[in-house]
C-alpha cells in the first residue's frame, strides 16, 4: 500500500481534520436528512445538446458572443458569497504573473490556501475506492455554500427557476463554491450529490460537465477533474471550474494526430510539453466526444492508472493527462527540490497554472522550474504508449500514428523542431473569444 502525507485543500468551511469529533447535533444547514426538508435552490436547466441534435461546425463570423446567462449566474452568486465572507481568503489579492519564456506558465502566490491544516495521509495506489460516509463529503457542506442546481433540460431551451425545492428522490447536481479558490469564480460541480458517488468518471457525469462548459459559452471557463491518486482531495464525485482570462500553456502546445474514431473524434498527442497527454476533439456531437473520453477514463480507472482531465474551449476540447507524481512521491523518487515547493501537480498545475505556497518559489519562478516540476508527474514514453494502447483498445481504435501530411498542428506560428526539447515551440493565444477563432454551436 502506497501512501503520502500532504495538506488537503479545504473546499468547505465544514471540512474538519480527520479524527475531529462531530459536535452534538448537526449545527449547520447541510444537505443531510436532518436539514434537507424544505431546502430550496435556484435551478438552471441548460439546453440538452443530445436531444437538440446540435453538432460541432465551424463558423467564420467574427462576432463577439454576449455574456451568457450561466456566466452571469455563476459570477453573481459567487460574488454574493464573497461579500458574505464565506471564503477563507481574498483570492483577488493573490499575486499572479506570467512566467517569462516560450510557454507562458502562469504563477500565483497563494499563501492562504493551505494554512491551518495538518498534513493528512492519503492512499495513492488505488484509483477506485468506495465512498465513505464517515469522512467529509459534499452532503456535509452548508447550504449557504451552494449556488444553484444544474441539469441538462428536456429540450433545446434554457430554463431558470429562481427557487426550486431540492428533491431527495431525484438527486440534483449542484454547483458550490470552493472556499479555497484559485481564481475568481472558482466553483465545484457535484453530479447527483445525494447519490454519494465516489470520485470516479462515468458517462453521465462527464457529459454533464461538458454541458456546463458549453453552456458557459466562454473559452476562459474551464472544468477540471482529478482522480484519486492524481490529487483529488475528496472521494465524492466532483469537478472544479473557474475563469482564467488567458490560454493555459497546455492548450497552446502543438499536437500530433494519432487516430480518429468511427464517430469522428480526433485523438492527438501533445508534443513538447512536460506532461505526456492526449487531446480529444471533434466528433459528430458533444456526446460522442464526451463518451469517447469517458470510455478511456473508465479503462484507466479499471487499470488503476491515475489521471487528470481538462475540459476546454467551451467543451470542444478535452485533455486527458495520465500521471504518476503521487506514486513517485510515495516511493521516494521525486527530487527533494521539487518536494520542497509543496506543489501538488493536479489538473490546474499540469495545465500550466502553478499555485505556489512560498514567496521564494514565486519570486524565483522560471520556465525551467515549472517544466522540472511538471515533468515529475509525466509517465515515461514507454509507459505512456502502454496506457494509450489500453485506452484505444477500450474505444476500438488503433494507436498507430497516422502518417499524413500536416498531422503536427501548431497552435500558433512557430519555427524549429517541435520534437526537440532544445527547440521547444508551442502556440500563441488559441482564442480571443470570437466565433471566428473557435468552434461554435449552430
Curated annotation (Swiss-Prot):
Coiled-coil blocks: none
E.C. no: 2.7.7.69
Pathway: Cofactor biosynthesis; L-ascorbate biosynthesis via GDP-alpha-D-mannose pathway; L-ascorbate from GDP-alpha-D-mannose: step 2/5
EC main group: transferase
Single Gene Ontology BP annotation: response to jasmonic acid
Entry annotated with the keyword Nucleotide-binding: yes
Compartmental location: Cytoplasm; Nucleus
pH dependence: Optimum pH is 7.5.
Active site positions: 238 (tele-gmp-histidine intermediate)
Modes of activity regulation: Not inhibited by dithiothreitol, N-ethylmaleimide, phenylmethane sulfonyl fluoride, ascorbate, L-galactose and L-galactonolactone.
Disruption phenotype: Dwarf. 20% of the wild-type ascorbate level, due to the partial redundancy with VTC5. Vtc2 and vtc5 double mutants show growth arrest immediately upon germination and are not viable.
Signal sequence coordinates: none
Annotated effect of mutating residue 238 to N: Strongly reduced activity
GO molecular function, one term: hydrolase activity
Stimuli inducing this protein: By jasmonate, ozone and high light. Circadian-regulation, with a peak in expression at the beginning of the light cycle.
GO cellular component, one term: nucleus
Record's keyword terms, sorted: Ascorbate biosynthesis, Cytoplasm, Guanine-nucleotide releasing factor, Hydrolase, Nucleotide-binding, Nucleotidyltransferase, Nucleus, Transferase
Keyword DNA damage: no
InterPro entries: GDPGP
Catalytic reaction(s) noted: GDP-beta-L-galactose + phosphate = beta-L-galactose 1-phosphate + GDP + H(+)
Tissue-by-tissue expression: Expressed in leaves, stems, roots, flowers and siliques. Highest expression in green tissues.
Task of the protein: Catalyzes a reaction of the Smirnoff-Wheeler pathway, the major route to ascorbate biosynthesis in plants. Acts as a phosphorylase rather than as a transferase. Uses preferentially GDP-L-galactose and GDP-D-glucose as substrates. Lower activity with GDP-L-fucose, very low activity with GDP-D-mannose, and no activity with UDP-D-glucose, UDP-D-galactose or ADP-D-glucose. Highly specific for inorganic phosphate as the guanylyl acceptor.
Subunit relationships: Interacts with TLP1.
Homology family: Belongs to the GDPGP1 family.
Name this polypeptide is given: GDP-L-galactose phosphorylase 1
Organism: Arabidopsis thaliana (Mouse-ear cress)
Gene name for this UniProt entry: VTC2
Amino acid at each position: 500500500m502506497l501512501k503520502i502525507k500532504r495538506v488537503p485543500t479545504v473546499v468547505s468551511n465544514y471540512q474538519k481534520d480527520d479524527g475531529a469529533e462531530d459536535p452534538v447535533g448537526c449545527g449547520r444547514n447541510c444537505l443531510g436528512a436532518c436539514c434537507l426538508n424544505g431546502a430550496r435552490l435556484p435551478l438552471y436547466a441548460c439546453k440538452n445538446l443530445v436531444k437538440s441534435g446540435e453538432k460541432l461546425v465551424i463558423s467564420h463570423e467574427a462576432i463577439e458572443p454576449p455574456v451568457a446567462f450561466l456566466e452571469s449566474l455563476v459570477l453573481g452568486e459567487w460574488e454574493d458569497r464573497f461579500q458574505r465572507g464565506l471564503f477563507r481568503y481574498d483570492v483577488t489579492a493573490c499575486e499572479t504573473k506570467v512566467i517569462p519564456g516560450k510557454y507562458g506558465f502562469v504563477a500565483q502566490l497563494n499563501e492562504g490556501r493551505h494554512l491551518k491544516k495538518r498534513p493528512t495521509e492519503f492512499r495513492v495506489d488505488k484509483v477506485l475506492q468506495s465512498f465513505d460516509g464517515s469522512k467529509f463529503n459534499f452532503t456535509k457542506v452548508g447550504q449557504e455554500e451552494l449556488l444553484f442546481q444544474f441539469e441538462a433540460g428536456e429540450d433545446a431551451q434554457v430554463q431558470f427557476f429562481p427557487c426550486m425545492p431540492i428533491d431527495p428522490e431525484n438527486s440534483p447536481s449542484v454547483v458550490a463554491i470552493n472556499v479555497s479558490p484559485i481564481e475568481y469564480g472558482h466553483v465545484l460541480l457535484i453530479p447527483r450529490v445525494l447519490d454519494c458517488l465516489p470520485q470516479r468518471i462515468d458517462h453521465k457525469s462527464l457529459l454533464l460537465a461538458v454541458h456546463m462548459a458549453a453552456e458557459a459559452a466562454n473559452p476562459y471557463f474551464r472544468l477540471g477533474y482529478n482522480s484519486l491518486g492524481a490529487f483529488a482531495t475528496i472521494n465524492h464525485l466532483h469537478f472544479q471550474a473557474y475563469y482564467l482570462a488567458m490560454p493555459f500553456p497546455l492548450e497552446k502546445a502543438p499536437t500530433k494526430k494519432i487516430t480518429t474514431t468511427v464517430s469522428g473524434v480526433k485523438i492527438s498527442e501533445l508534443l513538447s510539453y512536460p506532461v505526456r497527454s492526449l487531446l480529444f476533439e471533434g466528433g459528430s456531437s458533444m456526446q460522442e466526444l464526451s463518451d469517447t473520453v469517458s470510455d478511456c477514463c473508465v479503462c484507466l480507472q479499471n487499470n488503476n492508472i491515475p489521471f487528470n482531465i481538462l475540459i476546454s474551449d467551451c467543451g470542444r476540447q478535452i485533455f486527458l493527462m495520465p500521471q504518476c507524481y503521487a506514486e513517485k512521491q510515495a516511493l521516494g523518487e521525486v527530487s527533494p527540490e521539487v518536494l520542497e515547493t509543496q506543489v501538488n501537480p493536479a489538473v490546474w498545475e499540469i495545465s500550466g497554472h502553478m499555485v505556489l505556497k512560498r514567496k521564494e518559489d514565486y519570486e524565483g519562478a522560471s520556465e525551467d522550474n515549472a517544466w522540472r516540476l511538471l515533468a515529475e508527474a509525466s509517465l515515461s514514453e514507454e509507459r505512456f504508449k502502454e496506457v494509450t494502447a489500453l485506452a484505444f483498445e477500450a474505444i476500438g481504435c488503433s494507436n498507430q500514428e497516422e502518417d499524413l501530411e500536416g498531422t503536427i498542428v501548431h497552435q500558433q506560428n512557430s519555427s524549429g523542431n517541435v520534437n526537440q526539447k532544445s527547440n521547444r515551440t508551442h502556440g500563441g493565444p488559441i482564442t480571443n473569444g470570437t466565433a471566428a477563432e473557435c468552434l461554435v454551436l449552430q
